[in-house]
Structures are given as C-alpha cells and as structure tokens.
Amino acid sequence: MNLLLDTHILIWALNEDSRLPEKAKEMIMDEDNAIYYSTVSIWEISIKHANHPDNVEFTGKELAQFCQEAGFLPVEMRDKHVFALETITRAEGAPPHHDPFDRMLIAQAKAENMSFITHDALLPYYEEKCIIPV
C-alpha cells in the first residue's frame, strides 16, 4: 500500500514520539507499504519554523533531509493535485476546518491513489476514501 503521512504523523514517526498511534507505527513499519512525504509538509514546517522557531524544532530543509534518510519517498505538488482539491467533499454539518495544508495533502493522496494517514480528528469529516484515521 502507498501511504502518504500527514505532517504530524511524519514528525512523530521520525522522532519516535510516543504520540504516534500504534496503528500508524505498524503501517509505517510494514515492509509491504511504501511511505511517502509531501512537499506540502515541507512547506508547512518551513512556514511554521519561520514564524515560531522556538516551537518548531527544525526547518523544512531539515525535515526533507530526515525523510530522505528514513527512506521515505517524496510527493511533489503537481497541477493534478490542485485540480483534485476542487473535488474534495466534506460531510454536511461537519465542524469547521480551515487548514489549507491538510486539504492539499488529502487532494494529493486522492489524486495519487494513496492512503492518507492522519491523527487529526477533523479530517475524517472529509468524505474521501483515501483518509485513514489512526
């Protein structure tokens, strides 16, 4: 299975953080799965590090390097991902969600036929089969 990791799952996996859910850990460790990270996550961390360097421990460049060292594969943003963004649906009455990075990651997973691994409680409200909450 091709797994695209949400930014927080990516960071928790790289840091061996105790917040990484066991299900996510098992999926990442499964040798039958290919693990992907997105340039969208690199972009997100770059912005957060620039705005709050005391709260975000590394730069986007460092995150990309850690991902490569871990053997994770990159997914670069392409036009078809932006077009997929226009097709994402959200459940009626769902709580508000305004994170453009999350939406683009979902669009990438959808466009690339990947499973998107997240621990964000707001994301399962998107009616997209690619989302796997852990």
Could you say what each language-model-derived stretch is?
Residues Y36, V75, I132:
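General small-molecule cofactor/ligand-binding pocket signal
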